[in-house]
């Protein structure tokens, strides 16, 4: 790669150059981690070393996936450099997102289902007619909640990291017609503001005597806008179910990349990136639809048993598996009605944070815990 002279930040020992690309990408990763930790502690009120351990895993898988994806899409930076030498570029963020998503699903499914990471809430159950008994209800935290927590933070990391492409003078757009060695003519167009507000960007986008569209700047701008909307605003929108925020990230980054990829210079154009962007959009739309309309019904036991019962009916229609056992079908139908009736309604808090699809395990309070509960009840009602 023919890098500009100002792409090197400094040299170590006089012979090992440290590139601005690596520094800026590192800053983007650190800033994304800070946003993750902030929401983890102050918004979700979760503090556990296992969450911080995932940060270490995510950084490694993000870099590894991005590096491998450069090979998949045919990036010349991958072929011309050592695998671990990505100071000169060769990181495709889409691959990092894919690999980290897979690892995250595996990690959090194991981690959140462990006994030490179940949440307990005090509930009141009516025993007999008039006796109220306090109990602990133990639930699993949904993986979708973790998706809401982590995914939006990646956007701000991408927004910052895109500036590394500027210092490497890569991932720019095609040349604007009629700009050959004529900065004054371009200064009177819509890109003239760069000459005043960002003179370094203005100078850096003149490549081979022609002005190139600063795609890094455009993508960084829209990534920042979507980050603010998804990270700060969507949590306050009534009716947004868990998982919707996380899948909104896939939809947003897919749309941004799909539009901007078509304006890239042919040197940096990869058809695989177009396909991956479409995949992200499809995953985002299907994920949002599932979280908003399907998953919330599956959490309602009525709909869970309804789908199970419907499945058995369809299976019985096409096969003879259940046709000769009418008694079994009758028992299933009775269980379907019996289990669905007392569980039709759930609180918004449960629907938002505890996507449990199985019956919660109930623990009776000890006498000491019961006394504490009575004291708390007396304080809150006085």
Curated annotation (Swiss-Prot):
GO terms for biological process: lipoprotein biosynthetic process. It is found in: Cell membrane. Keywords: Cell membrane, Membrane, Transferase, Transmembrane, Transmembrane helix. The keyword Electron transport does not apply. The keyword Membrane applies. GO terms for cellular component: plasma membrane. Its main location: membrane. Its EC number is 2.5.1.145. It is an enzyme of class 2 (transferase). InterPro entries: Lgt (IPR001640). It is a multi-pass membrane protein. GO terms for molecular function: phosphatidylglycerol-prolipoprotein diacylglyceryl transferase activity. Pathway: Protein modification; lipoprotein biosynthesis (diacylglyceryl transfer). A 1,2-diacyl-sn-glycero-3-phospho-(1'-sn-glycerol) binds at residue 162. The chain crosses the membrane at residues 18-38, 53-73, 91-111, 213-233, 243-263, 274-294, 302-322. Catalyzes the transfer of the diacylglyceryl group from phosphatidylglycerol to the sulfhydryl group of the N-terminal cysteine of a prolipoprotein, the first step in the formation of mature lipoproteins. Belongs to the Lgt family. This is Phosphatidylglycerol--prolipoprotein diacylglyceryl transferase. It comes from Mycoplasma genitalium (strain ATCC 33530 / DSM 19775 / NCTC 10195 / G37) (Mycoplasmoides genitalium).
